Amino acid sequence: MNPTERLEQGGSDLLLMLPGALMTPQHMVAAGLFSALAGRRLSLDLVAPDLHAEGADNRIALQTLERDWLAPARTRYRKVWLGGISRGGQLAVSCWAGRVGAVDGLCLLAPYAGGRLTTNAIRRAGGLAKWGATGDQLDDPDVRLWHWLQSPPPAVPVFMGYGERDRFADGMSLLAQHLPLQRCEVVPGDHDWSAWLPLWQRFLDSSPFDVRP
């Protein structure tokens, strides 16, 4: 497991940002996510934990996320946001949609919406409301996410965006239709930092967080 990265600047709010697959918290630092926040006077702390050691079944990762990160943070911060990149974004949406842990907002950079087998099945069924999953299929974290989105929890503020050339864009556009979004940001770029860093900067510039004196 890679070390957790933190930017603690006395913020009243916290954002837990989850790395994507094959990504470490250190990649997020190197890409400029932490320095972009440090350059703004937002009353926001940023923590990037590494949950990859929990394995492919995200039910364990979700339990760890709530027990070790979200629950302690709620005792310390006014508001706790959850976010992630790619697979990390999928885990963040799953945490909210599955009512695993209470969050005050979501920051989703190119959140992985599941394989085409699942998203195509939803489209063939005529939409999410008409689609159904069997008990065995619910062992798949991709399927569980969409099952939870059929009966979503109360809405929270959500920022979501992805690159216009992202190879997973079809699934993300479907996901965006089922999140409480005012709009989904689509920027030049692929499923990489060419899109993710500009999206992160847009999130920080439009975010609801207070400004430090």
Feature locations, PLM:
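Alpha/beta-hydrolase active-site loop signature
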Residues: 22, 50-55, 113, 191
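Short, surface-exposed "cap/lid" segments of acyl-processing enzymes
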Residues: 1-41
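The feature captures the conserved acid-bearing segment of alpha/beta-hydrolase catalytic domains
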Residues: 128-180
